[in-house]
């Protein structure tokens, strides 16, 4: 299933802290903006995948307007998309290298 959630990217001295206000406990951090985008997608996919597998309720995403009201000067909203069906397929089809010695 495809999901779209807003993440809050907060700039600090060491890089970025990323949180998803609609998903408690869905947090990550990164050194730069490129890594922040990658890490936010990764943590969102993992959070939603586990929630689906455990049949936990998944909160509906808040609107941009609603979330934008409470931002501070060092925070930015970024829309992140996650496709749990694709993640499951990617996990299932992961290749494994094995070394074998034949006599």
Where are these regions (language model features)?
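Short, proline-centered helix/strand-breaking motifs
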Residues: 21-24, 103
């Amino acid at each position: 299933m495809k999901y779209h959630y807003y993440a809050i990217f907060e700039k600090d001295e060491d890089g970025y802290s990323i949180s998803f206000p609609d998903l408690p406990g869905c947090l990550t951090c990164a050194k730069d903006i490129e890594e922040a985008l990658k890490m936010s997608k990764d943590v969102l996919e993992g959070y939603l995948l586990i929630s689906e597998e455990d049949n936990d309720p998944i909160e509906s995403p808040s609107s941009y307007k609603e979330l934008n009201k409470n931002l501070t000067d060092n925070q930015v909203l970024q829309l992140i998309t996650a496709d749990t069906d694709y993640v499951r397929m990617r996990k299932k089809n992961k290749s494994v290298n094995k070394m074998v010695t034949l006599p």
